[in-house]
Structure formats: structure tokens, C-alpha cells
Amino acid sequence: FIVRPRTEGRIRASYACEGFLGEYEGKVRDNLYMCQAGLTVASVLADGSISACASIRSDYHQGNIYKDDFVDVWENRFRPYRDRRWMKKDDCATCKWFRYCQGNGMHLRDSQGNLLLCNLKKL
């Protein structure tokens, strides 16, 4: 669906923040995908929860704007998002794409950090 409209140039279509797609990246996005949760993105949700991304599970929320200092959360509690080596396990441990993908999107991990879905394997 996305490749054809991008090729035709009639509409600007792009594959959203739903995981790394390997060789298809250039066909469906303008840049390589890498989850930016906690790197360049942070979210404050309606209830005040501070999350590295609005799409991440609630057990990954790192604080609350009504109780915690946002800068402290950004600088200290988001550290696991910035060093993704902990994600290099299971299928990711031997994947040739890990250096680009960095373990896929945080919203695709369970509460123990296990990958629930690898978009690359689905292709």
C-alpha cells in the first residue's frame, strides 16, 4: 500500500513508528527507522504520566509530572532507553540488522523487555 503511492508521487505516504523493516526501509520511509523513545522523544500523558513515548506500555512509564521533576526523569530514568545493549537478546542477539534496528520499537516489548513482534521476521 505505501510503496506504490510513494513511487507514483501522488500522495506523501510513509510507514509510521512501527518497527524496522530492513531492505524495505527506503521504500516506505524517508529515513531508516530507529525507535526514538527516550532518545529524542518524551511524552506527558493526560494523567500526568511521563513516558518515553505515548505508545509504550504503562509499566514502562518513568514518572508523573505532578510528582516528579521532568528533567530528572529525562536525564536519569530514561537511561535504559539510551543504552540498548540490554535488548540484544533472543532473536536480536544474532540479527545482522541490530546495529540499525537497535531492538525495534519499545512499544513492541513486554514488561520483561522481551520482543513481542519483529517486523523484519514478518516480511
Please tell me what each predicted stretch does:
Residues 1-58, 98-100:
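A C-terminal junction/extension of Radical SAM enzymes
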Residues 55-123:
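Flexible mid-to-C-terminal extensions adjoining Fe-S/redox cofactors in radical SAM and related proteins
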